[in-house]
Amino acid sequence: MCQNGAQGSFRGAPPLSKEDVIEMEGTVLENLPNAMFKVELENKHSLLCHISGRMRKNYIRILPGDKVTVQLTPYDLTKGRISYRHK
């Protein structure tokens, strides 16, 4: 229980809101172990990405050559999360 009117504290960085996430489009170059993918963005930068939880839950398969939407955080622009596979 909190004492002296102190609020609960959190560890690490505060959670990101949707406004803090950078969304970009790219193409999957190759599959890597542990559900990781190498993705090349439209601006020719290469990223290491993992699948979002909803895509994993719905068994959405991602293959090399697929167009995807990638979410990046401003803290680490070398890693991302694949949030959508375009048809």
From Swiss-Prot:
One of its GO terms (cellular component) is cytosol. Pfam families: eIF-1a (PF01176). Belongs to the IF-1 family. HAMAP family: IF_1 (MF_00075). Keywords: Cytoplasm, Initiation factor, Protein biosynthesis, RNA-binding, rRNA-binding. The keyword Nucleotidyltransferase does not apply. Its main location: cytoplasm. It comes from Magnetococcus marinus (strain ATCC BAA-1437 / JCM 17883 / MC-1). One of the essential components for the initiation of protein synthesis. Stabilizes the binding of IF-2 and IF-3 on the 30S subunit to which N-formylmethionyl-tRNA(fMet) subsequently binds. Helps modulate mRNA selection, yielding the 30S pre-initiation complex (PIC). Upon addition of the 50S ribosomal subunit IF-1, IF-2 and IF-3 are released leaving the mature 70S translation initiation complex. It comes from the Bacteria. InterPro entries: NA-bd_OB-fold (IPR012340), RNA-binding_domain_S1_IF1 (IPR006196), S1_domain (IPR003029), TIF_IF1 (IPR004368). GO terms for molecular function: ribosome binding; rRNA binding; translation initiation factor activity. The gene is infA. Component of the 30S ribosomal translation pre-initiation complex which assembles on the 30S ribosome in the order IF-2 and IF-3, IF-1 and N-formylmethionyl-tRNA(fMet); mRNA recruitment can occur at any time during PIC assembly. Residues 16-87 form the S1-like domain. It is found in: Cytoplasm. This is Translation initiation factor IF-1.
